[in-house]
Amino acid sequence: MITGELKWYTVASRLEQAIYAELTVAPDRHGVVPGAIAWDACDCGLLAASVGQIYPTEQFPNPALARVGNGCDAPWEAAEIIMQVVRCTPTHDDQGNPPTTAALDTSAREILTDAHQMMRAVSTTLCQMNRDREISDFVMRANTPQGPSGVCGGNELRAVVSLPRN
């Protein structure tokens, strides 16, 4: 099992590295980031992983709402790992004309390819980590399209992972 003070960083880093290796077009900027994921310099692409909420659990993936019995603490800890791949998206030209449908189509293909590759990388990695007993359990959430916001758009994938408390 993954343990210690950096256990959630370790999980997030493994997932970020798996996505990076799976992407057909790997972004220049990638890594584990603290807190909310900022879309800085999305023109060259961005892959970021972050650790969201961390909470005690007795019945994964549900947070422990109260102590049960005489126990002092829940036996498990769960964390939400947030992963995003963001790309440059088409926008209006200097005359204010909207992007062409061909440009939008190309962007949609790239972003949907990223979604497929993200989901495959995360699923494969978490399944292997679970089989190898590096983690206790996991649940993948739905992929959620992001943006466009400004000239950036992409995908967000979340997974909840369980480890023993320590």
Residue ranges and their predicted role:
Residues 38-40, 68, 84, 123, ...:
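Secretory pathway export signals and precursors
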Residues 75-90, 150-165:
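Oligomerization/assembly interface segments of phage tail-like spikes and tubes
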Residues 22-31, 105-162:
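Acidic-leaning, charged glycine-interspersed low-complexity segments
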Residues 1-73:
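Small/polar-rich, solvent-exposed N-terminal microdomains that initiate assembly or binding
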Residues 41-43, 71, 87, 126, ...:
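The N-terminal extracellular segments of secreted preproproteins, especially immediately downstream
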Residues 57, 88-93:
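Short regulatory "switch" loops immediately downstream of catalytic or recognition motifs
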Residues 93-109:
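A solvent-exposed, charged loop/short amphipathic helix patch at secondary-structure junctions
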Residues 45-47, 75, 130, 155:
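General secretory precursor processing signal
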